[in-house]
């Protein structure tokens, strides 16, 4: 019955823990109340035992020892089953956690893919907004026509738009990240709160249980003390009673012996028998009563002792191990046991003595019945009794000592209790600290929520600001419309006013012209009167001459004597002199009048010139203002058009933003489901962001390169504009550049400091890495030492095994020897003794086998530890290998970056070469312009030569037609009237134009002011927006830093948890040690119990010994169970350690990835530093170049000013020379009268000199002609050189362009040809200078000769002197021209030097352009000056030719007269000859006087006319010069104003850009600081992890020490076993005597042994099941790890595909940006060509008056041609756009195909993984379902298992499906007798969200992935649920945005859904 009862109880205990319910994976409770125990039949008065953690003190014992053993066995079985069930539940929990983690990873991968595809879709949307790409139009027409000035606005608007888009994207991404982080943080906090709550509950429950146990133990100890005291007293009493009884027995024996001696033999025998029987009866009674009482007390004590032992074991499992004290207690118990045995032996000997004495009495009575005699007791008996008494006394003393020791132990236990209480207090403190940290984290969460709200408020504010900006835009449009209306009105008003003012001015000019004409007519009349008076005077002089002739005739007639003739001659001479004086006075008067006329004429010509200059200036102003007005109108139109475009784009963007916001709201539900995927996908996003940023940087670099290439095209047309703009802005830009350079230097200094800090941190990291490597090496050495120690331990274990084998052999031999001796001694009971011995031998063998199994289990534990250590070593080696691979990756990255930098340097060199080519092209164009100007000059020279020929012809005509002067005068007057009329008309037109231009300028200024105000408002708004964005960035950075701090705090908490787990594992090890020690103490106590029971009786002693043997067996079984529990615990510990290792791996991966990110960020910072350094170096170089160019410009300006001063000095010298000439002319006239007397004397010398001088003049003329020819040849050669230079430049430009297109340009082209030509020119100029010097020497000689022959100069010499003076003046002017030529040479040299400098510098176009423009202007001025000089030289040459002709004629006349005189002089024939001579002389004199008068009059007339003509020409020239100067001044003013406006605009834009750059830099700096803080925190965490690893190593060392201690303990235990073997040898002798009594109980023992064997078999079967389950779990873990690796590979492939697509898209975007910029630059080029054409037309100001209409027509034609070219260029651009679009479409199709392939592969892999998991779960469920039957099976059928997962909804419909992966749901989900199915809420929510999202927007890649995910989940659920739910279908009818997908895609989707 007892067996059946125990079996039923075992069944009940097995069935009760099977039904396990769990609401969550956090807590698992063993529900023992689910099954009613009433259903189970329990009989035989057996009780039900509750399954509690502590063993209660109310255990009911049976009536016999057999019942006690069965009850203890049931308790152990129950405990074992409970622990197994707990282990199974823990395994289920772990597997469920693993499944949840895997599902989280899968979801995170999916979410990352969705986010990446969203980013791609967002980039597509932005591309659609930013680029207006037409898909279908074949012909391309420009949407807007903008000038160069408007292009800047367009570029700025594009930049602002791009920035706005980027900010919008960043804000949306940050919002999504914030929401995602918030949700993830909330989920983590909820999980941690649950974990903390469960831990707190467990700790409170544990502490309460421990306190209860300690109190119970304390009570039990007190009870034990009392029992020991009672036992002591009872033993003392028993010993005293025994002493008394022994004394009485001895006395009675002595009395009986005396009586026997005295009495008779028969009576004595009877009496003796009776007395002996009575004595024996009394002795037995006295002995039985106390022994029976002690046996009952002993049983009670043993029960309580067992309870105390168990509780002490539990206490020691929680407290510190006190092995030494337990060993001392065991030794004391052994001593008491030995003493007890000795006492039992003593009592047995007494009994033997009594029996022997009784037998001896009988024998003596039989033998010596006849002989009377006495018998004395032997002395040995007395000695033995005395020894026993002495031993008893010593034992009593020893027991007293033990009591004292027990008191000390009680004190120690009290101290332990206090220690446990202190530990409890510490745990309470830790709990309080944990709660505080939880509160802090909750506060941080609240702060994060607040900040999120703030960010949302800021976003609302940004939206309101956007609305305000739109309103402002509308206002601007209205203002622009008003301005256009105002401009139109102002145009009409201005034109009307200008017409009116022109009419008024015309009238005024006409009045002035009439007044001038009246004045001129009056003056002409006066001149005619004077001419008439002079004629009358001439008539008088003629009459006087006639009278003189008559007188001369009368004198000839009357001369008879020479004296009378001579006197008469003298008188006539005197009369002639008087007449000459009168004529001189008259001539002086005439000259004065001529001077006055000349002054008046000069004033009039000056006024006319001024008027003409004013008219020209006004015309130029009119043209410029009209052009500016047109440009402004175009700008306004473009601005309005751009504003409209921007409004449309903003509306599109807003619509897209609204759509995105709706999509975001629709997809929030999906984001909630995919929250757990965020942590895994965030790293991917970060890597993708880094890739995107690197790609953006590459895009920006490529864009910069494209911009540079495009700027090369624009620079060809924008040179003149840039020159005019940058001429005056250099100084301001220099100052600003200085300030910018200072700021950049400060930034550089700060960046260098930061770089130094980063370098120091990098050094610290390297040092930490070295330290970590050293630690790893040390750990490796320690591990080697541990391995050696383990090997030593293994050898020691083997030696111990050998010793045990030897001991077994010795024991077997001893038993055989004992049995042999026993067989020889006892022949009666041989069979029984043999059987008994066999049983004992079997029992001993089983004991030894159990010990061997224990040792093997210890061996297995050590081997497992060794394996764990080896795994750790392998992991460390893997970590080292990973670090090496990472180092190699970093090296490769650095190499790639270096290659990229080299490529960038190559691109920069290409840019620089292209710039040099542009400069050369510009120079060639300038050379072409110079050629054109030189050709124009040649045409002008030819024209001037023609004019000279015409002037010569006119002079001849004037000489021949002297009578026609009056008619010519009338013609000239008419022409002057016409000119005046034209001048007045031009004035009126000019004034009208001026007024119009002023009005237009005023209106334009107002419009510009308004535009500037609008721009300022927009800039203020932009700055405010930038500030807000910066504030948002700062808040976001703060949020990220806080989140990182929270993450680091969480990591620290996790580390603390790991430490606490390690301590708990150490405590568990200590508990295991204590349990082993307590087991040994239990064994010793069982032995003591068996020895105490032997003291009752021999039979009871044998029974008690058997009970002790059974207890030892039970203890062995309990040890086996404990070992199994240890195995389970070790498995759990290994799993936990594996989990920890995995966590550490994950953390290590996190750290590695963070470290990579930080390295990448450091590299980026380095790149930024390099870029900043490059920018600073460029800025410095630009400043240096600007400074150099400023110096050059200043020097050139100084040179120009010096030249201007020289020209002024030359003009003054010319004036002085004219005055000097006039003075000399007067002096010459005076000297003619004085030198007339001397003329006859020096005629001969004069004739010779004249002939010589004539030859010299001819030589000079020839030389002059040669020099002119040489100049012409030089000019032609210069022009040819320029042409060749231009051709060479064009050829070089083309060659370099071809090279730059195909190959990188190598070196710059030398200008050797230009240098050679310049050298030729220099040599020719030197030759001309030599000739000039020769001319000067010859002129000096002529002057000297003239000074020597001054006395012999005649009247005609005065004319010659004037001619010489004119020649001298011409030579002076020629010298000036030569000086100017020398200056031109110097300028050419300077130009050559500048060209060389430009070739050397090659980096800054602006400075080169400025210098080039200045040089061109200087050359233009010099050319103009040379033209003026050439005109002057030509005029002087004409004058000199006229003079030469006059001199020749006069020379011929002089020679004829001389010949006549010579013929007349030698002959002296008397008075007739003298008279004839006198008459001839008189006639000659009259003819000479007549000719002189005629010549004088002609000279005066010609000089007056020439002077008038010269004055007119000079006045016209002056007026033209003034007009040109005024035009230049006006142009400069206008250009300066426009440049100032543009520079202001540029500076404002630059300031805005600089502010934005500063804001970006500050934001970036803050980000870097935050990242540095994060890096430092991560470094601290890394250090913390290192310290933890060190602590873990220390713990391992401690464990090794514990292992060594266990080793020593095992050795001590072996020693104790040897001692026990000795005691067993002693007991063997006793057992031989007891074998006869134990034979009866053999059958009961055999039955019990069979029961135990059956139980052992059951335990082994259960152990095999557990092992199978463990193997299955390991297989599942391996499968899941493989799946994770597959998913990681898929993720890597997806990342590669995404990166490739992103790179392709970036390339496409680059090409599109390049095309757009080319379009814009072409627009700029067209505008700049128009401006250059206008400037060229303005530069040709001299021909503007005559060629305005032609130029307008040419301009219109050119504009039409440019427009046609523009249309062609735009068509080309459109074609390129189409090609790019087609390529984009192809790439998008490829992307879609790749994505579809990826999705299909993912779906397939996911389906395969889910199928595999479902199969595994079904298999495991089917394997685990065989255990339950009966009512338990009904419970399992009633409780359907469901997985607690989020995505993989595995549902089982079979009632028998039970698995270790799943737990029983609550009553809400499951009911008894019914099947319940559960679909996760994630599928429903995802279905709803997908349907909603597909109704709005086009089908994107993310929707495809969601559809596939839904399909996969539905398919998985269908397979798990036997297709309980159909797959969800997407509503495709609502999809709008793109065309339907191809049929293949639909078929694939249908196939996936059907699968």
UniProtKB/Swiss-Prot annotation:
PANTHER family listed in its UniProt record: CENTROSOMAL PROTEIN 2 (PTHR23159), CENTROSOME-ASSOCIATED PROTEIN CEP250 ISOFORM X1 (PTHR23159:SF31)
Subcellular location: Cytoplasm, Cytoskeleton, Microtubule organizing center, Centrosome; Chromosome, Centromere, Kinetochore; Cytoplasm, Cytoskeleton, Spindle; Chromosome, Centromere
UniProt KW keywords: Cell cycle, Cell division, Centromere, Chromosome, Coiled coil, Cytoplasm, Cytoskeleton, Kinetochore, Meiosis, Mitosis
Major localization class: cytoplasm
Transmembrane segments: none
One Pfam family of this chain: OVT1
Entry superkingdom: Eukaryota
One GO-annotated biological process of the protein: meiotic cell cycle
Record's compositionally biased regions (Basic residues): 1938-1948
Entry function: May play a role in the organization of the spindle apparatus and its interaction with the centromeres.
Assigned GO CC terms: centrosome; cytoplasm; kinetochore; spindle
Region (Disordered): 1865-1896, 1912-1955
Name listed for the protein in its UniProt record: 227 kDa spindle- and centromere-associated protein
Keyword Coiled coil: yes
SUPFAM superfamilies the record matches: Tropomyosin (SSF57997)
Keyword Manganese: no
Skewed-composition ranges (Polar residues): 1878-1896
Any coiled-coil regions, as ranges: 82-129, 152-317, 385-1747, 1770-1813
């Amino acid at each position: 019955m007892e067996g059946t009862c125990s079996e039923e109880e075992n069944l009940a205990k097995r069935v009760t823990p099977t039904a396990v319910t769990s609401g969550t994976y956090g807590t698992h409770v063993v529900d023992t109340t689910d099954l009613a125990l009433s259903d189970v039949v329990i009989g035989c008065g057996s009780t039900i035992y509750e399954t509690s953690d502590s063993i209660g003190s109310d255990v009911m014992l049976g009536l016999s020892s057999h019942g006690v053993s069965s009850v203890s066995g049931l308790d152990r079985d129950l405990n074992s089953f409970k622990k197994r069930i707990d282990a199974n539940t823990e395994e289920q929990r772990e597997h469920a956690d693993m499944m949840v983690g895997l599902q989280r990873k899968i979801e995170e991968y999916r979410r990352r893919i969705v986010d990446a595809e969203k980013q791609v879709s967002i980039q597509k949307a932005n591309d659609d907004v930013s680029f207006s790409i037409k898909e279908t139009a074949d012909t391309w027409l420009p949407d807007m026509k903008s000038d160069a000035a408007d292009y800047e606005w367009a570029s700025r608007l594009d930049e602002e738009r791009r920035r706005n888009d980027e900010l919008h994207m960043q804000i949306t991404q940050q919002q999504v990240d914030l929401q995602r982080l918030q949700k993830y943080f909330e989920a983590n906090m909820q999980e941690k709160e649950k974990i903390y709550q469960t831990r707190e509950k467990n700790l409170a429950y544990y502490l309460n249980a421990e306190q209860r146990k300690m109190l119970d133990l304390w009570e039990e100890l007190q009870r034990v003390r009392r029992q020991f005291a009672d036992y002591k007293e009872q033993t003392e009493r028993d010993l005293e009673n025994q002493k008394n009884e022994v004394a009485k027995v001895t006395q009675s024996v002595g009395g009986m012996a005396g009586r026997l001696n005295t009495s008779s033999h028969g009576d004595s025998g009877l009496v003796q028998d009776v007395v002996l029987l009575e004595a024996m009866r009394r002795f037995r009674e006295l002995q039985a009563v106390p022994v029976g009482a002690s046996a009952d007390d002993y049983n009670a004590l043993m029960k309580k002792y067992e309870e105390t032992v168990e509780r002490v074991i539990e206490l020691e499992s929680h407290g510190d191990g006190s092995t030494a004290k337990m060993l001392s207690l065991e030794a004391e118990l052994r001593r008491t046991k030995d003493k007890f045995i000795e006492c039992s032996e003593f009592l047995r000997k007494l009994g033997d003595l009594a029996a022997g004495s009784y037998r001896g009495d009988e024998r003596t009575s039989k033998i010596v019945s006849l002989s009377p005699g006495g018998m004395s007791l032997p002395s040995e008996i007395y000695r033995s009794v005395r020894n026993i008494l002495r031993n008893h006394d010593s034992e009593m003393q020893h027991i007293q000592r033990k009591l004292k020791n027990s008191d000390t132990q009680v004190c120690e236990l009290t101290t332990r209790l206090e220690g446990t209480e202190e530990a409890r207090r510490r745990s309470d403190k830790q709990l309080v600290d944990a709660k505080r940290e939880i509160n802090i984290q909750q506060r941080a969460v609240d702060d994060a929520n607040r900040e999120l709200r703030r960010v949302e408020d800021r976003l609302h504010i940004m939206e309101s600001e956007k609305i305000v900006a739109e309103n402002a835009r509308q206002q601007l449009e209205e203002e622009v419309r008003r301005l256009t209306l105002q401009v139109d009105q102002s145009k009409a008003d201005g034109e009307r006013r200008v017409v009116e003012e022109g009419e008024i001015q015309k009238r005024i000019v006409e009045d002035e012209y009439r007044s001038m004409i009246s004045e001129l007519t009056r003056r002409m009349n006066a001149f005619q009167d004077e001419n008439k008076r002079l004629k009358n005077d001439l008539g008088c002089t003629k009459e006087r001459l006639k009278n003189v002739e008559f007188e001369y005739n009368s004198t000839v007639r009357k001369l008879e004597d020479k004296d009378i003739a001579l006197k008469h001659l003298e008188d006539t001479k005197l009369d002639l002199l008087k007449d000459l004086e009168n004529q001189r006075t008259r001539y002086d008067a005439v000259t004065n009048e001529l001077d006055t006329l000349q002054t008046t004429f000069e004033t009039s010509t000056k006024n006319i010139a001024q008027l003409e200059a004013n008219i020209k200036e006004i015309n130029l102003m009119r043209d410029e203002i009209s052009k500016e007005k047109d440009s402004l109108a175009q700008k306004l139109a473009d601005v309005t058009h751009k504003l409209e475009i921007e409004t449309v784009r903003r509306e599109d963007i807003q619509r897209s933003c609204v759509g995105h916001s709706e999509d975001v709201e629709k997809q929030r539900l999906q984001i909630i489901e995919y929250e757990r995927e965020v942590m895994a996908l965030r790293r991917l996003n970060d890597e993708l962001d880094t890739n995107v940023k690197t790609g953006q940087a590459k895009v920006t670099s490529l864009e910069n390169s494209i911009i540079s290439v495009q700027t090369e095209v624009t620079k060809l047309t924008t040179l003149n504009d840039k020159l005019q703009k940058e001429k005056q802005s250099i100084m301001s830009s220099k100052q600003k550049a200085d300030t910018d350079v200072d700021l950049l230097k400060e930034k550089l200094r700060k960046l260098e400091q930061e770089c130094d800090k980063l370098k120091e941190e990098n050094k610290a990291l390297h040092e930490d890495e070295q330290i970590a490597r050293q630690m790893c090496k040390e750990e490796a050495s320690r591990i080697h030492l541990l391995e050696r120690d383990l090997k030593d331990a293994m050898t020691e274990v083997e030696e111990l095994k050998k010793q045990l084998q030897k001991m077994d052999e010795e024991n077997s031999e001893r038993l055989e020897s004992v049995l042999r001796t026993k067989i020889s001694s006892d022949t009666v009971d041989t069979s029984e003794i043999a059987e008994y011995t066999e049983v004992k031998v079997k029992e001993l063998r089983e004991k030894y086998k159990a010990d061997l199994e224990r040792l093997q289990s210890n061996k297995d534990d050590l081997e497992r530890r060794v394996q764990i250590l080896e795994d750790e070593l392998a992991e460390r080696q893997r970590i080292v290998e990973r670090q090496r691979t990472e180092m190699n990756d970093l090296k490769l990255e650095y190499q790639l970056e270096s290659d990229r930098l080299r490529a960038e340097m190559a691109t920069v060199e290409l840019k620089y070469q292209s710039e040099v080519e542009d400069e050369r092209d510009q120079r060639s164009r300038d050379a072409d312009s110079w050629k054109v100007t030189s050709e124009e000059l040649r045409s002008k020279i030819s024209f001037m030569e023609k004019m000279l020929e015409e002037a010569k012809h006119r002079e001849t005509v004037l000489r021949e037609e002297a009578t026609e002067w009056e008619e010519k005068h009338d013609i000239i007057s008419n022409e002057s009237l016409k000119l005046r009329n034209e001048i007045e008309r031009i004035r009126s037109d000019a004034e009208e134009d001026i007024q119009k231009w002023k009005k237009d300028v005023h209106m334009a200024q107002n419009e510009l002011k308004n535009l500037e105000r609008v721009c300022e408002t927009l800039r203020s708004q932009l700055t405010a927006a930038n500030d807000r964005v910066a504030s948002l960035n700062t808040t976001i950075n703060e949020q990220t830093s806080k989140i990182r701090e929270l993450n680091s705090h969480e990591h620290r908490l996790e580390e603390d948890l790991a430490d606490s787990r390690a301590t708990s594992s150490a405590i568990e090890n200590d508990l295991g040690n204590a349990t082993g020690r307590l087991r040994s103490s239990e064994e010793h106590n069982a032995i003591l119990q068996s020895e105490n029971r032997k003291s009752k009786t021999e039979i009871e002693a044998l029974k008690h010994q058997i009970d002790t043997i059974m207890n030892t067996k039970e203890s062995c079984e309990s040890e086996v169970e404990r070992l199994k529990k240890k195995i389970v615990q070790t498995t759990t510990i290994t799993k936990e350690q594996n989990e920890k290792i995995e966590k550490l791996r994950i953390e290590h991966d996190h750290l590695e990835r963070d470290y990579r990110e930080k390295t990448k960020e450091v590299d980026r910072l380095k790149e930024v530093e390099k870029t900043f350094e490059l920018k600073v170096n460029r800025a410095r170089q630009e400043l240096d170049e600007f400074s150099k160019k400023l110096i050059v410009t200043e020097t050139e300006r100084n040179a120009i000013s010096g030249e201007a001063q020289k020209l002024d000095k030359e003009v003054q010298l010319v004036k002085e020379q004219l005055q000097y000439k006039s003075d000399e002319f007067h002096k010459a006239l005076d000297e003619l009268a004085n030198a007339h007397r001397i003329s006859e004397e020096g005629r001969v010398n004069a004739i010779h000199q004249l002939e010589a001088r004539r030859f010299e003049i001819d030589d000079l003329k020839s030389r002059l002609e040669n020099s002119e020819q040489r100049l012409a040849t030089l000019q032609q050669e210069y022009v040819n050189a320029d042409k060749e230079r231009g051709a060479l430049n064009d050829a070089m430009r083309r060659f370099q362009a071809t090279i730059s297109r195909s190959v990188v340009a190598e070196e710059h082209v030398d200008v050797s040809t230009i240098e050679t030509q310049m050298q030729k020119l220099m040599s020719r100029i030197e030759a001309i200078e030599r000739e000039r010097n020769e001319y000067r020497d010859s002129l000096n000689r002529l002057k000297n000769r003239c000074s020597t022959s001054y006395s012999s100069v005649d009247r005609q010499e005065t004319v010659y002197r004037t001619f010489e003076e004119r020649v001298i003046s011409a030579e002076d002017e020629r010298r000036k021209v030569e000086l100017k030529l020398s200056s031109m040479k110097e300028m050419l040299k300077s130009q050559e030097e500048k060209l060389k400098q430009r070739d050397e510098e090659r980096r800054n176009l602006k400075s080169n352009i400025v210098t080039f423009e200045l040089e061109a202007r200087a050359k233009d001025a010099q050319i103009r000056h040379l033209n003026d000089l050439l005109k002057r030289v030509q005029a002087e040459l004409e004058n000199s030719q006229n003079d030469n002709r006059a001199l020749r004629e006069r020379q011929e006349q002089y020679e004829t007269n001389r010949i006549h005189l010579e013929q007349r002089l030698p002959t002296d024939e008397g008075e007739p000859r003298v008279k004839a001579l006198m008459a001839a002389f008189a006639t000659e004199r009259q003819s000479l006087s007549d000719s002189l008068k005629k010549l004088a009059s002609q000279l005066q007339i010609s000089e007056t006319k020439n002077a008038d003509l010269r004055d007119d020409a000079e006045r016209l020239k002056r007026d033209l010069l003034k007009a040109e100067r005024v035009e230049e001044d006006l142009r400069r003013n206008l250009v300066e104003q426009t440049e100032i406006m543009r520079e202001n605009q540029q500076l404002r834009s630059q300031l805005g850009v600089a502010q934005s750059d500063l804001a970006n830099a500050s934001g970036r700096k803050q980000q870097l600081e935050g990242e540095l803080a994060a890096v430092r925190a991560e470094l601290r965490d890394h250090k913390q992890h290192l310290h933890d690893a060190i602590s873990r190593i220390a713990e391992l060392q401690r464990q090794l020490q514990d292992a060594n201690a266990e080793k020593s303990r095992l050795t001590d235990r072996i020693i104790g076993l040897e001692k026990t073997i000795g005691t067993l040898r002693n007991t063997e002798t006793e057992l031989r005597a007891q074998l006869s009594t134990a034979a009866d109980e053999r059958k009961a023992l055999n039955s019990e042994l069979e029961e135990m064997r059956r139980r052992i078999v059951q335990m082994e079967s259960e152990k095999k099941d557990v092992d199978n389950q463990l193997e299955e779990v390991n297989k599942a873990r391996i499968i899941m790890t493989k799946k994770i690796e597959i998913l990681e590979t898929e993720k890597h492939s997806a990342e590669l595909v995404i990166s490739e697509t992103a790179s392709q898209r970036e390339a496409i975007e680059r090409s599109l940006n390049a095309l757009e910029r080319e379009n814009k630059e072409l627009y700029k080029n067209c505008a700049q060509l128009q401006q250059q054409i206008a400037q060229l037309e303005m530069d040709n100001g001299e021909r503007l008056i005559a060629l305005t209409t032609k130029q307008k027509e040419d301009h219109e034609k050119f504009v039409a041609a440019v427009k046609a070219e523009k249309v062609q260029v735009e068509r080309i651009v459109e074609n390129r756009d189409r090609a790019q679009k087609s390529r984009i479409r192809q790439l998008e199709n490829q992307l879609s195909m790749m994505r579809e392939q990826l999705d299909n592969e993912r779906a397939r892999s996911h389906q395969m993984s889910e199928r595999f998991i479902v199969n595994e779960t079904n298999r495991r469920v089917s394997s685990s379902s065989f255990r339950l039957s009966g009512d338990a099976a009904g419970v399992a059928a009633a409780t359907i298992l469901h997985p607690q997962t989020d995505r993989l909804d595995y549902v089982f419909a079979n009632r028998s499906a039970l698995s270790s992966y799943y737990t029983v749901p609550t009553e809400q989900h499951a009911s008894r007798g019914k099947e319940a199915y559960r679909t996760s809420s994630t599928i429903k929510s995802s279905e709803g969200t997908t349907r909603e999202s597909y109704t709005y927007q086009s089908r994107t890649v993310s929707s495809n992935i969601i559809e596939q995910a839904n399909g996969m989940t539905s398919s998985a659920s269908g397979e798990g649920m036997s297709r309980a739910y159909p797959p969800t279908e997407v509503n495709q009818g609502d999809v709008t945005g793109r065309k339907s997908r191809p049929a293949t895609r639909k078929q694939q989707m249908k196939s996936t859904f059907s699968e």
